């Protein structure tokens, strides 16, 4: 990622791959006739014609586009590095691997294979959710539509033209933690995309469940739902939402003891 490139890729055939190393966010665009953003941006300056000494930097001319794929060349595969990369496929059957970081993958036309790798990775599609069929397979998922049939693994989110879908629904994953949190403090909010998205974003940023709960209390969300900011009222609300019956005085006091640290 610290290298400097200013080049055009030409290839006569075979199965080819562009791979980026390092942790800087990069763009790999496999579309023929397109630019990728790899390595350090190109920088320019003015120099004295006699001494060649730099007389003025030209940051206004800085260009992140560094690697060009010739318009008749087909590169099949892209592998990202440790940053939050964007990988764009072409009309071939591409293999796109995000690597580390929270990556965004777009296969385009063709039957593509995509692996998000580490991080919170997203596979994007141009059309609406109704245009595709999502199928669970051994070891991953596949999605079929006008673009072809793609298979993917290590992907946490799908983005369509009209909506986003979270796939990381286990209790240890962010979308699962979001549903658990809202199920306790505000079950009705699970049907509100804006609230779900806001809470999910907090978990994606690394917040713990305790952090999210405290923030919900601080901004008044829990108090608004419970009708009170009193710990005992909040504990009773949470118990009712989870168990379905009111908490006894003893149970409510036990829950409060966890909240205030007496029984942490």
Model-based region annotation:
Residues 26-31, 135, 148-156, 166-170:
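Short amphipathic beta-strand/extended segments with alternating polar/hydrophobic composition
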Residues 83-87, 95, 100-109, 113, ...:
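Solvent-exposed, low-complexity segments and loops of surface/extracellular structural proteins
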Residues 157-264:
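Composition-driven recognition of low-complexity segments enriched
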Residues 8, 17, 27, 74-77, ...:
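Discrete beta-strand positions within long extracellular beta-solenoid architectures
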Residues 13-15, 22-24, 32, 79-84, ...:
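Extracellular, beta-strand-rich repeat scaffolds characterized by small/acidic residue-biased motifs
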Residues 120-147, 159, 225-230:
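Acidic glycine/aspartate-rich repeat arrays in secreted/surface proteins
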Residues 1, 27-77:
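Acidic/polar low-complexity surface segments
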């Amino acid at each position: 990622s610290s290298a400097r490139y200013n080049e055009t890729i030409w290839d006569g055939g075979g199965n080819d791959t562009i791979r980026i190393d390092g942790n800087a966010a990069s763009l790999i665009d496999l579309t023929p006739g397109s630019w990728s953003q790899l390595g350090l941006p190109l920088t320019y300056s003015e120099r004295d014609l006699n001494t060649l000494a730099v007389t003025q930097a030209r940051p206004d001319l800085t260009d992140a586009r560094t690697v060009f794929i010739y318009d008749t060349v087909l590169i099949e595969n892209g592998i990202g590095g440790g940053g939050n990369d964007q990988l764009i496929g072409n009309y071939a059957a591409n293999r796109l691997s995000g690597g580390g970081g929270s990556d965004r993958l777009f296969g385009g036309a063709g039957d593509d294979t995509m692996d998000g790798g580490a991080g919170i990775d997203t596979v994007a599609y141009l059309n609406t959710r109704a245009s595709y069929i999502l199928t669970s397979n051994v070891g991953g998922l596949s999605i079929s539509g006008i673009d072809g049939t793609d298979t993917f693994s290590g992907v946490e989110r799908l983005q369509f033209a009209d909506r986003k879908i979270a796939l990381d629904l286990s209790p240890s994953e962010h979308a699962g933690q979001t549903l658990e949190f809202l199920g306790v403090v505000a079950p009705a909010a699970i049907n509100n995309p804006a609230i779900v998205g806001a809470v999910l974003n907090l978990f994606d940023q690394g917040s713990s469940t305790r952090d999210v709960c405290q923030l919900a209390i601080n901004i008044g969300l829990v108090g608004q739902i419970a009708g009170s900011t009193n710990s005992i009222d909040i504990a009773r609300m949470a118990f009712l939402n989870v168990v379905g019956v009111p908490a006894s005085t003893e149970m409510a006091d036990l829950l409060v003891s966890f909240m205030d640290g007496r029984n942490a």
